[in-house]
């Protein structure tokens, strides 16, 4: 689960991090009032969406008067902001952040942290190249990025934070301030079950003070049950409607941009299915894992969610029967196809527990379902069926 910039900043501020102050506005009049309360002569209007690249997309603008603040806010609120991180539809802007202007600054730095799956520990990354996408820095000048891994048994140690501070070119009192900042960021990360935090840019102001000008936080969705305050910050408007509906039925769904819908049990098998569709010249429209305990109701809902995507021209169902029996899945598929009134080609590949019986049920049913033997056969058949449709 992602947080908005203003939510991330308020959370980080509660851990002692210096942030760029701002006020949320839901309309032009509120933006004008927020401008009047801004301590600087110039304010920054920031569209609040769960996506990066807002500045280049016109979602971050400087304003010098309350009238201009109102005008800019009204031009953003109620629209969809399209950035390099969104799809073609963009993300809805429901409110803006009216923030103090912290520029000019001496320099812009980068500080971020993620859960490193290789070491299973929190790893901090830092760079002197702040204010730009860290992916671009990693590609063009990887030597300017350095990292440290934190031992969870002892936590972030002061000498580690000082080491990072010195590598960032900080000196004197800035080092002590940075140690406090980085320690607070780590504490916030662990206590709130983050899976990602990014402060970009971390500015060194003209007076030498540090400030978090922007902040991104991703929270581990699997830990939300023990983070009720964080869960309450969830903004469903920033998520795909089909993904939200899938979550209601415990279906793992991620919308993609292809035309072949996928329904699979197991995340690994789902990824392999998408890969082989691509290999045979098709484009997957989604990732959908119905889980090991697939039932008729879940299969029906999965069909509905897949077919709500108007770009879907065919569906590939790939089921490995382990705990769940393939004959039961076959019955659920037949019932679901009838109930949902599926009009696009459907290819089904069953393997494992009672696979032969499941295939027989499909072949003897009165619905148009194409049976496949093996993963390659299934991928070839769905790609051919979509092309022929």
Swiss-Prot record:
Source superkingdom: Bacteria
Protein name, as recorded: Succinate--CoA ligase [ADP-forming] subunit beta
Subunit and partners: Heterotetramer of two alpha and two beta subunits.
Disulfide bonds: none
The ATP-grasp domain, residue ranges: 9-245
Assigned protein family: Belongs to the succinate/malate CoA ligase beta subunit family.
Pathway: Carbohydrate metabolism; tricarboxylic acid cycle; succinate from succinyl-CoA (ligase route): step 1/1
GO CC, one annotated term: succinate-CoA ligase complex
List of residues binding ATP: 46, 53-55, 100, 103, 108
Keywords associated with the record: ATP-binding, Ligase, Magnesium, Metal-binding, Nucleotide-binding, Tricarboxylic acid cycle
Top EC category: ligase
Pfam families named in the record: ATP-grasp_2, Ligase_CoA
GO process terms (BP): succinyl-CoA metabolic process; tricarboxylic acid cycle
Species whose genome carries this gene: Psychrobacter sp. (strain PRwf-1)
Lineage of source species: Bacteria, Pseudomonadati, Pseudomonadota, Gammaproteobacteria, Moraxellales
EC number per UniProt: 6.2.1.5
């Amino acid at each position: 689960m992602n947080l908005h910039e203003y939510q991330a900043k308020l959370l980080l501020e509660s851990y002692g991090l210096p942030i760029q102050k701002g006020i949320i506005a839901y309309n032009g009049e509120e933006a004008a009032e927020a401008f009047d309360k801004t301590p600087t002569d110039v304010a920054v209007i920031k569209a609040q969406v769960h996506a990066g690249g807002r500045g280049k997309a016109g979602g971050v603008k400087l304003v010098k008067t309350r009238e201009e603040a109102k005008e800019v806010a009204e031009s953003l609120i109620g629209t969809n902001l399209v950035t390099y991180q969104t799809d073609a539809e963009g993300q809805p802007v429901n409110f803006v952040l009216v923030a103090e202007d912290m520029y000019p600054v001496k320099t812009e730095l980068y500080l971020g942290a993620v859960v490193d799956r290789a070491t299973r520990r929190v790893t901090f990354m830092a760079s002197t190249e702040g204010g730009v996408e860290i992916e671009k820095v990693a590609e063009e000048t990887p030597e300017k990025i350095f990292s440290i891994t934190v031992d969870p048994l002892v936590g972030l140690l002061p000498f580690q934070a000082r080491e990072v501070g010195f590598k960032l070119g900080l000196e004197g009192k800035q080092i002590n301030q940075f140690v406090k900042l980085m320690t607070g960021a780590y504490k916030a990360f662990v206590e709130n079950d983050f899976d990602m935090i990014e402060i970009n840019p971390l500015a060194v102001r003209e007076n030498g003070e540090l400030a978090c000008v922007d902040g991104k936080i991703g929270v581990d969705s699997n830990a939300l049950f023990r983070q009720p305050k964080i869960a309450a910050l969830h903004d469903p408007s920033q998520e795909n409607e089909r993904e939200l509906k899938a979550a209601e039925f415990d279906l793992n769904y991620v919308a993609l941009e292809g035309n072949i819908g996928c329904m699979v049990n197991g995340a690994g098998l789902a990824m392999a299915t998408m890969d082989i569709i691509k290999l045979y010249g098709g484009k997957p429209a989604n990732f959908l894992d119905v889980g090991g305990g697939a039932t008729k109701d879940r299969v029906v809902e999965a069909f509905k969610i897949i077919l709500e995507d108007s770009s879907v021209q065919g569906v590939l169902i790939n089921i490995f029967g382990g705990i769940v029996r393939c004959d039961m899945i076959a019955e659920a598929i037949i019932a679901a196809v009838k109930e949902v009134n599926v009009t696009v080609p459907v290819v089904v590949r069953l393997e494992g527990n009672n696979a032969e019986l499941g295939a027989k049920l499909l072949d003897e049913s009165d619905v148009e379902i194409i049976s496949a033997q093996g993963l390659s056969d299934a991928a070839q058949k769905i790609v051919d069926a979509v092309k022929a449709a």
